[in-house]
UniProtKB/Swiss-Prot annotation:
Span list, region Disordered: 61-83
Gene that this sequence comes from: MTA1
Free-text function comment from the UniProt entry: N6-methyladenosine RNA methyltransferase that plays a crucial role in fungal phenotypic traits, virulence, and stress tolerance. Mediates the methylation of mRNAs to produce N6-methyladenosine (m6A)-containing mRNAs. M6A is a modification present at internal sites of mRNAs and some non-coding RNAs and plays a role in mRNA stability and processing. Mediates specifically acid phosphatase APHA mRNA stability through a YTHDF1-dependent m6A modification of the A1306, A1341, and A1666 key methylation modification sites.
Deletion phenotype: Drastically lowers the m6A level of APHA mRNA and reduced its expression. Significantly decreases the methylation level of the ZAP1 mRNA. Exhibits a growth rate defect and displays an irregular colony margin. Leads to a significant decrease in sporulation. Also significantly reduces virulence on chestnut stems and red Fuji apples. Displays more sensitivity to both oxidative stress, osmotic stress, or cell wall integrity stress.
Protein name listed in UniProt: N6-methyladenosine RNA methyltransferase MTA1
Enzyme kind, highest EC tier: transferase
GO MF: methyltransferase activity; nucleic acid binding
Keywords noted in UniProt: Methyltransferase, RNA-binding, S-adenosyl-L-methionine, Sporulation, Transferase, Virulence
GO biological process: one example: methylation
Length: 336
């Protein structure tokens, strides 16, 4: 079966999430529409897989205009020296380049679905069926979480890693002051007590080397939580024409973010697909694709998931963060 044949053409494919625009045969390369993945997360997986339910009313997420051309990014002057590509960056660049090649050769459709960019506010914030949220910081809600939260098959962390460019842009996007301060915050989360024996932890990370060491080092947070890294995924951001938003060989800026996946030590659980490359046309700043549909093997049949530092809700999941209702607010949605 080639890539074109694998696009949704048969009955099974039609029941897949609309947000998955393409995936190759071994599902190692996935083209995912960011806003649609969040729209689908407002309903249960069963409702997403059929024509009935809330999605039929097409509650739409307000999005930014998708980028049509790559971003301009400065590069060091020739001969400036001092900057070299890490082995990790070279490996990710190779995987990203291969994903772009597969898409070019095997996929002929659009790289993102039509977006709603004009607001038409609803009367109140939307809370998906079966969702539960803690609206507050890790420190303020920790005791309540420890007392009330169940164990989860999947925990997703999207920490506010230190980011000078985010602070410069002043997008009302809160980031930590330093790696030390974010480590202190993450150490407060009782991951070990609330991750199921065969559960997985997925952590969005930046490309800063210190972030990986903070999590995976001998004295890192994974060790503190009794976990071990089992996989790494890449989220590759592209334009509407399929080009990376910046060149994959750029020195100062990379067109990808990464997801580290960990399990309990001694567990045999692994993601169904290893080393995945998720490919998307990006949306609003800090808005990432919802991962629920990509971890079906972990979540079925329980759908017991948790997202920490969440900025939107997911049906059937717990969500926790001081901006947990941000993208559930009326100004971000319309019905069509």
């Amino acid at each position: 079966m080639n890539g074109r044949e694998h696009r949704r053409g048969d009955e099974a494919a039609r029941r897949e999430a609309r947000s998955i625009l393409f995936q190759n045969q071994d599902r190692s390369i996935v083209l995912i529409d960011v806003p649609t993945s969040i729209e689908e997360a407002q309903a249960s997986p069963e409702e997403v897989g059929c024509d009935a339910g809330p999605l039929r009313k097409r509650r739409r997420l307000i999005s930014s205009e998708p980028p049509h051309l790559p971003f301009k990014t400065p590069e060091p002057k020739a001969g400036s020296g001092g900057l070299t590509e890490s082995v990790s960056d070279l490996m990710i660049a190779a995987a990203a380049t291969e994903a772009l090649r597969v898409l070019q050769e095997s996929y002929a459709g659009p790289f993102c679905l039509p977006r709603v960019t004009r607001p038409n506010p609803l009367k109140s914030a939307f809370v998906p069926k079966g969702s539960f949220f803690l609206h507050g910081t890790v420190s303020s809600e920790r005791d309540r979480f420890a007392a009330e939260a169940p164990v989860f098959d999947l925990i997703v962390l999207d920490p506010p890693w230190p980011n000078r460019s985010a602070r410069r842009k002043q997008r009302n996007y809160r980031v930590a002051d330093s790696l030390g301060s974010i480590r202190e915050t993450l150490s407060l989360i009782p991951i070990a007590a609330h991750l199921a024996p065969d559960g997985l932890l997925a952590v969005w990370i930046t490309n800063k080397a210190g972030v990986v060491e903070l999590l995976t080092g001998p004295r890192g947070l994974f060790a503190q939580w009794g976990l071990e890294q089992v996989d790494e995924w890449t989220w590759l951001k592209i334009t509407t024409s399929g080009e990376p938003i910046v060149d994959v060989g750029s020195t100062w800026r990379k067109p990808w973010e990464r997801i580290l996946i960990a399990r309990r030590r001694g567990s045999s659980r692994k993601p169904a697909c290893r080393g995945r490359v998720l490919v998307s046309v990006p949306d609003l700043h800090s808005r990432k694709p919802n991962l629920r549909g990509l971890f079906e093997d972990v979540l079925v049949p329980s759908n017991k998931g948790l997202e920490i530092f969440a900025r939107n809700l997911t049906a059937g999941w717990w969500s926790w963060g001081d901006e947990v209702l941000k993208f559930q607010q009326p100004e971000y949605w319309v019905e069509s």
